[in-house]
């Protein structure tokens, strides 16, 4: 299957009102797919992107199953982000929510699942360089976000091993036009952040267009090679 010959698909983006979710949904709509967004809030800007919005809770099994009916690909970008909140909130959204998405995909016969994770699942407080998907998880995690995202991606990988065509992506510190978090935080704290190390420390970041396109390419490749 080539990009020029691919048939339009019906897809669902969880967390479609978020920074990454909206970018993924917009790109999908722009290439001709029928796109549904699933999230708790109202997001009028999605209509301008050609996206149909379904309002629902990520931990609501019935709502998710209804949203997945007739859908071929699910992009699961919804998550509770760091850094604040009780562990129970992270578990509900990131762990229970992902379990509900997987179950809905199975019941509705969804063909492919693309799950957004994070490199934080590998972070143990030490520098990470040259890591890949074979790098093992740390003995413990330093935040509820990392711990619950690790549990979530393990659920997806287990579902994939059991036959659901699924893939996990780990973009880091996504930024770009419309960024509500990364760059604004840096600018707001300019000259007030504590310096760590000798000033030569590196951090990987992901531009929003690249992150969104990676999700589309992952789904397309998964369609070519479900195994």
Regions found by a protein language model. Name each.
Residues 150, 164, 175-185, 217-227:
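Glycine/proline-rich active-site loop of Rossmann-fold NAD(P)-dependent oxidoreductases
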Residues 33-41:
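Conserved glycine-rich Rossmann-like NAD(P)H-binding loop of the short-chain dehydrogenase/reductase
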Residues 45, 51, 55-96, 104, ...:
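NAD(P)H-binding glycine-rich loop region in Rossmannoid oxidoreductase-like domains
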Residues 187-193, 203-227:
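Alpha-helical substrate-binding/gating segment
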Residues 10-31:
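N-terminal Rossmann NAD(P)H-binding glycine-rich loop of SDR-like oxidoreductase domains
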Residues 80-81, 119-123, 135, 172-175, ...:
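Active-site segment of SDR-like NAD(P)-dependent oxidoreductases
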């Amino acid at each position: 299957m080539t990009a020029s010959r691919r048939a339009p698909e019906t897809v669902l983006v969880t967390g479609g009102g978020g920074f990454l979710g909206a970018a993924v949904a917009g790109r999908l709509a722009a290439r001709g797919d029928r796109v549904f967004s699933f999230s708790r809030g109202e997001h009028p800007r999605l209509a301008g992107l050609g996206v149909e919005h379904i309002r629902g809770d990520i931990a609501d099994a019935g709502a998710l199953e209804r949203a997945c009916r007739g859908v071929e690909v699910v992009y699961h970008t919804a998550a509770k982000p760091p850094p604040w909140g009780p562990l129970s909130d992270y578990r509900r959204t990131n762990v229970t929510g992902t379990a509900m998405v997987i179950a809905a995909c199975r019941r509705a016969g969804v063909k492919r699942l693309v799950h957004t994770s994070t490199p934080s699942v590998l972070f143990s407080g030490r520098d990470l360089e040259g890591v890949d998907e074979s790098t093992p998880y740390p003995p413990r995690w330093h935040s509820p976000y990392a711990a619950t995202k690790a549990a979530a991606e393990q659920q997806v990988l287990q579902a994939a091993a059991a036959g659901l065509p699924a893939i996990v992506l780990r973009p880091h510190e996504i930024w770009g036009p419309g960024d509500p978090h990364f760059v604004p935080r840096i600018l707001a704290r300019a000259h007030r952040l504590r310096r760590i190390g000798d000033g030569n420390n590196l951090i990987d970041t992901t531009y929003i267009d690249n992150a969104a396109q990676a999700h589309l390419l992952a789904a397309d490749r998964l369609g070519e090679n479900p195994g």
